[in-house]
Amino acid sequence: THTRSSAASDVYKRQVQDVSTKNYKYIPQLTMAGYSIMIKEISKQTNHYITHIFVQAGVGGLAAGVVAGVAKYFKRIPKIVVVEPDRADCVLQSIKANKLKKIRIKKESIMGGMSCNEMSLVPWQILKKSSDYCVSVADNNVAKTTAMLKDRKFSKGSIIAGECATPGVIALIGLANNLKVRKLLNLKEDSNILVIGCEGNADVKLYKQLLSKGRK
């Protein structure tokens, strides 16, 4: 974030990032608190018990903010499924290793905001204890999922979902089509599933390309 003072001669820049490190935690914690407001709003908009939440992860801030919101605002705790690109699965690899794991990204994911090679410190402290499952999804499902969400046949209204808003839906469809995994997660016809989407068509050019490709 760049800040410009009122005096033209007094110009300075300040970078605000949501990635926490050993000596930089306060701002990322505020960012995560902001993410948790989504959960507060959702808890007020439905009386249904949400059984599962699918939430995407880059460095883990959004996912950890959702978990914190669930703990604060939900009366019953759903299963939490964290989803990330298979080209940048730093959360999955960290949880498997039971320690922060820095991975090597051989090729960047099309889900650019989630193409991260290392988790943020504060989210790690939350997700290592509170996420039920971690899964990774492939880039080749992004375009058709973007197009599917845009199609009014899929929902009551057209859903404008950019590349980073698709992972939860991709994971849900994939897991639901696997009988063994479906039983493991206790996914049923009467499950109430919350899928978090984190962006619209932020990159208009890329969004149009994904729609075109996904509709073929």
Predicted regions and their residues:
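Glycine-rich phosphate/pyrophosphate-binding loop at beta-loop-alpha junctions
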Residues: K22-K129, R182-K216
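Conserved Rossmann-fold dehydrogenase catalytic segment
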Residues: Q17-Y26, N140-T145
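Structural signal for conserved beta-strand scaffold positions within catalytic alpha/beta enzyme cores
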Residues: Q15-D18, V82, S136
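Short, glycine-/Ser/Thr-/acidic-enriched flexible segments
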Residues: T21, N141-V142, T166, G200-A202
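Single conserved hydrophobic/aromatic residue that forms the stacking wall/gate
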Residues: T1-A8, Y12
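The feature captures the short pre-catalytic strand/loop hairpin that immediately precedes
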Residues: D18, K101-E108, T146-D151
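A structural micro-motif
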Residues: K13-R14, P78, D132, S158
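Active-site-adjacent helical/loop segments in soluble small-molecule enzymes
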Residues: M38, M119-K188
